[in-house]
UniProtKB/Swiss-Prot annotation:
Record region (Disordered): 1-108, 430-502
Keyword Cell membrane part of the UniProt annotation: no
GO biological process annotation, one example: vesicle-mediated transport
Keywords tagged on the record: Ubl conjugation pathway
Lineage summary: Eukaryota, Fungi, Dikarya, Ascomycota, Taphrinomycotina
Species this protein is from: Schizosaccharomyces pombe (strain 972 / ATCC 24843) (Fission yeast)
Name under which the protein is recorded: Vacuolar protein sorting-associated protein vps901
One CC-aspect GO term: cytosol
GO molecular function, one term: ubiquitin binding
InterPro entries: CUE (IPR003892), DUF5601 (IPR041545), UBA-like_sf (IPR009060), VPS9 (IPR003123), Vps9-like (IPR045046), VPS9_dom_sf (IPR037191)
Every CUE domain range: 529-571
Amino acid sequence: MDYPSFHEDPTKDESTVAEQRKGQSNEEKPLIDLNDSLDEQRNAYNEHCKNHDQQPSQQVRNMEDEANQYEQTDSSSDQEVMNEKQSLDKENRNDNIPHENNPGQQEINEPIFDFHMFLEQLRSSSAEPVAKYLKSFLSEFTKRRWTVNYQVKLIRDFLKFINEKIEQYEPWASGSQAEIDNAKEGMEKLVLNRLYTSLFSPEIAKSGIPLSSEHSDDVEEDRVLSEKMELFQWITEENLDIKKQKSSSKFFKLAADELRRINDYHAPRDKIICLLNCCKVIFSYLRNVVKEESADMFVPILIFVVLQARPAHLVSNIQYIQRFRSPEKLTGEVMYYLSTLMGAMSFIETLDCSSLTITEEEFNAQIEKSIKKMEERKLSEKSESKTAVNENATYKDPVLSRGLSSSIDVSTGVALVNLPEELENMKYLQIDTPESKEYPRSTRPRGSSHSGSFTTDSGKRSRRNSNKYVGSSDRPPYRVSRAYSSSATHSPIVHEEQPVDDGLQQNDDLREATTASLETAEAERLQAREKAEAITALRAMFPAFDSEVIEVVLNAQQGRLSSSIDSLLEMS
């Protein structure tokens, strides 16, 4: 650095000296012109000091610029490191869903649902209030026939109410948010498992109960779609412009099996999982075999899989899911796959020659063959039905034959005595048909501690309460004791419990314990069966791998079928 030639005044501040050095070294205009008057020299110096206080020197500015540049470089380096780390984490993560180039393919890795744990928690003494709320609701719900819209309203209102109670009572109140969410999922599954025969249209039809207009429409649409799928079961991949690959048949069969399992489960969540597994198997095929993913390729394969699977009651299943699955869960990936399946069903229902890659002559020939097969099947079913009726008519149960003549007079007398009361009771019972026809139902007491309004000594009271629950009443069909009502604004209406005979109470408790044990055993059985079926399906797709290896992969992927397929494809 070139120092100035004149002597520096030690009383001047460093910034002034630096500015003077700069002016002299760069041979700029002198700070003070000695030819000027003393006042002009003083003004020039004051102006310089004023400007110097407001503006930093060039050296300071350079130092600040260098510091800013260093900070930006350091920040940029940190950002690059973070981006690289996120990229590595993403690559190392077990991605068990299709890529993000499709709006419906993004999945949130939710915690594994443990229904068995929820049932164990519900049996604990601290959860007794929640169990009583549940028992009361189920008891009251099954005493009436509700319209579909009112069924949906009652169940959603109860689940909202009971979810608030789950957060208030142990063992969930002090648990983690994951345990609370698991309990809410478990409660929805438990409620809909118990009420399945009253909510699922084919189950109602099977019981012989007259159907409401909505349930009747479900059953009729099931029949139409089933006949369409049978009519077009001859369709091949080429007819839908699907490029056939070496391993496509294994993937399509596995996807069809997953979709067909939708009728094995009662909870909407479980039915959705069957649909998701079906769709994810298809996307695994596109990703790993075809090496290309798009909705244009996914939809034709889904249509082909539906035709191959031909699942029964598909329309009723979709309606059941939309009605009773929590609306907060019907979003994102689930809604995408659900709407895509509905589009595939609509395509099948309106399918004609122009929808396929096929000549009109071949199309008509295949349709004629299918119609002939369908007629032969119906004739065979009628013949088998007549044979079964004849066999039942000729068979006589020796036990019933011995006791029939001796008991006929007594049973007839009892029936005649009770007939007026039964006819009177029928006037107060309703069914959810558009014509509001009355539906006969027995009003015998159930002997439950939560059925106080249906005691033997209060027939009129029973009928009065019967009417109150049906229609537009805002009162929910559940009743709890005052001891468990913690909030007047959110709790159901409180009723005093009627005294119940100890023997009836013991029988009721035994029945509840037996039901709970059966539900636990059923949950364990389904879990074991799902694992065995998944291993069998994966062995069929990957015969080169040992069963132990497949099981290890399945366990590592927490039972997720599609991610297990991806892992095995990478290993092969």
